[in-house]
Amino acid sequence: IGMVVECKDGYLVGNDGCKYSCFTRPGTYCANECSRVKGKDGYCYAWMACYCYSMPNWVKTWDRATNRCGRGK
């Protein structure tokens, strides 16, 4: 019996709709944050935002089409 697990890659977003900033964070910050949401791994992309791999589909990720960062709630 096989099991299909849906997962995705992407930028983590906070409640404000903005990407998780990692500019002034320690090197392990993004990997830890990605792990916290059950992602496989993560890194600080260009020292600006956390990018995660193999996260469950329920995790909110940044999308240009639905970006609401800086636009209020």
From Swiss-Prot:
Give the note: Negative results: does not affect the cardiac Nav1.5/SCN5A, the peripheral nerve channel Nav1.7/SCN9A, and the voltage-dependent potassium channel Kv1.5/KCNA5.
Supply the PROSITE patterns for this chain. Answer: LCN_CSAB
Q: Which organism is it from?
A: Tityus discrepans
Residues where Arginine amide occurs?
71
* UniProt protein name: Toxin Td4
Q: What start and end residues bound the annotated signal peptide? A: 1-7
Subcellular location per UniProt equals: Secreted
Is GTP-binding there in the keyword field?
no
InterPro entries according to UniProt: LCN-type_CS_alpha_beta_dom, Scorpion_toxin-like, Scorpion_toxin-like_sf, Scorpion_toxinL, Scorpion_toxinL/defensin
Where is this chain primarily localised?
secreted
Top-level division of the source organism's lineage: Eukaryota
Keyword annotations for this protein, in alphabetical order, are: Amidation, Disulfide bond, Ion channel impairing toxin, Neurotoxin, Secreted, Signal, Toxin, Voltage-gated sodium channel impairing toxin
**Domain LCN-type CS-alpha/beta spans what residues?**
8-70
Report if keyword Transmembrane helix is assigned. Answer: no
